[in-house]
């Protein structure tokens, strides 16, 4: 335990908080190029084929990002926008691809929660 005099001279250092999305380098989003589009299986007890993409960001880092929503148009060399946000049942997937931005189309026929999937407001039905 330090003495008061030692604390006056040196002070205490507070540990720096590490970001959960380090590859973005303190930016809200980053642009990137899809290197590979694949499916991954989640941890127990879940079962599915989750769609993910390996993306090389503009800062040179390679990350694995989740493609949300039903169906997508991504393939190799697609330009995508990547945001932070992990997928709890996919180990190593700490990023999301933004739907409706750059080459990634929004989810069509989406009625609720449209803003999260880049879906436009549907036209009102004719009376």
UniProtKB/Swiss-Prot annotation:
Q: Does the keyword Isomerase apply?
A: no
InterPro entries assigned to the protein according to its UniProt record, in alphabetical order: NA-bd_OB-fold, Ribosomal_uS12, Ribosomal_uS12_bac
Q: Name one GO molecular function term.
A: rRNA binding
Indicate whether Ribosomal protein appears among the record's keywords: yes
Keyword line: Methylation, Ribonucleoprotein, Ribosomal protein, RNA-binding, rRNA-binding, tRNA-binding
Q: Pfam families under this entry?
A: Ribosom_S12_S23
Which parts of the sequence carry 3-methylthioaspartic acid? 89
SUPFAM superfamilies (alphabetical): Nucleic acid-binding proteins
Origin superkingdom: Bacteria
Q: Name one GO biological process term.
A: translation
Looking at the UniProt record for this protein, which Gene Ontology cellular component terms does it annotate, in alphabetical order? Answer: small ribosomal subunit
Q: What does this protein do?
A: With S4 and S5 plays an important role in translational accuracy. Interacts with and stabilizes bases of the 16S rRNA that are involved in tRNA selection in the A site and with the mRNA backbone. Located at the interface of the 30S and 50S subunits, it traverses the body of the 30S subunit contacting proteins on the other side and probably holding the rRNA structure together. The combined cluster of proteins S8, S12 and S17 appears to hold together the shoulder and platform of the 30S subunit.
Question: What quaternary arrangement does the UniProt entry report?
Answer: Part of the 30S ribosomal subunit. Contacts proteins S8 and S17. May interact with IF1 in the 30S initiation complex.
| Record-stated family | Belongs to the universal ribosomal protein uS12 family.
* PANTHER family in alphabetical order: 30S RIBOSOMAL PROTEIN S12 FAMILY MEMBER (PTHR11652)
Q: Spell out the protein name for this chain.
A: Small ribosomal subunit protein uS12
